[in-house]
Amino acid sequence: MKIILKQDVAKLGKRFDVVEVKDGFAIHFLFPKKLAAPLTKKAIANRDLFLKQQQEQYQKNRALAEKLKLVIEQTPLTFQLKQHDGKPYGSIITKQIINLAKQQRLDLQRFMFKDNVRLQFGEHKLILHLFEEITATLTVIVNPENGTTN
């Protein structure tokens, strides 16, 4: 009997796969547990509609990530860090970068950063993971504050 899976089933297939199984297995195990449905024209139409919507959502998310990449790479973030005798007093962390980015209308999330960041003086290039293979390079500039602390 040909069926369409409603959920992932171990050793059988993934959701929306069309598989051939024995009648008893389908009728007594898969159908009662709502793991599968008989292969009908309606089931095939639902499957095709779902896969089409999933592909459209994927393309939409990919396009948004590409736009965000362009904005991130054109927008450097600049911080002022206190100093004492020319040495940095503290450091810039991921949370501060995210907050400044939000003020500049960049929607960065913590999971985009590969590691926790602690930056000192200078220009730093951070690689952000946006979407699957799409990465962006964020420029963060940390300048010493004009006054010194004692």
Swiss-Prot record:
The keyword DNA-binding does not apply. One of its GO terms (biological process) is translation. Signal peptide: none annotated. It comes from the Bacteria. SUPFAM superfamilies: L9 N-domain-like, Ribosomal protein L9 C-domain. Keywords: Ribonucleoprotein, Ribosomal protein, RNA-binding, rRNA-binding. GO terms for molecular function: rRNA binding; structural constituent of ribosome. One of its GO terms (cellular component) is cytosolic large ribosomal subunit. Gene3D superfamilies: Ribosomal protein L9, C-terminal domain, Ribosomal protein L9, N-terminal domain. The keyword Calcium does not apply. Binds to the 23S rRNA. Belongs to the bacterial ribosomal protein bL9 family. This is Large ribosomal subunit protein bL9. It comes from Mycoplasma genitalium (strain ATCC 33530 / DSM 19775 / NCTC 10195 / G37).
